[in-house]
């Protein structure tokens, strides 16, 4: 039997011979302390212990050890930076978003500087209207034209609480978000006479995480809850999100409402379209829609179509009382196909 032995080290130099042993850091992974400003280098030494003795084996022969190997060095740089919003990003004292300029500042931190704001809390303090030239939050790392399965994806990963305020998208404008990863958007009202895309998140795409490796785990995409599509709103594509992602990139949509008078698919030329989602993997629960949905193929009252075949696509305790019009084939009152 082979048993791995792990030991993590840290150093102020990029050198595996000058590190200091980290007491208790003996697992395959290690989460460093990021509360202090500065640059620290981390690496792990691994050695395998062989244990194949029985009760007749002499004590000194019961264990043998393989050669020690060392991991690559991981650089962790912690920078103390003040942000332009009131609050500190905690659940009890979230960053306060009062104006469109606050949203623009958030976008620049994500799209230009690569901040993800993992688990940081933001709260809208009033109604906000996006400008007609709004560029959504979330993009690709500088110098990269493709996400490479998430490796070069600069996505928002925080928690946005709309606090029951209304976000209005300009006529013909783009939605609030482009790319998100493990984000939460909640307690928000959405409006826009003609939103040129999806209503909330414009890019639902394959995301295997920051290393782009499926085998190390795939993040969920978003949890969307208590979001209301207000009467008079219309979208070119699905009302919240859609696209084609990995089956493991789950989206949870819960307690969401689309009022009567909402139009989904105002051109009538889109396929894979529904009130809340287009191509979709995840769960919709406790949602209701009275919207009018137009499309060509795979047009559904709540969901256009199941996305990746191996992923989930579940709708529970939800209803559709609106109208679905499909000029092609595959249409349904709940899911198109």
What are these regions (language model features)?
Residues 79-337:
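Surface-exposed repetitive/solenoidal architectures
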Residues 1-80:
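Ser/Thr/Pro/Gly-rich low-complexity disordered regions
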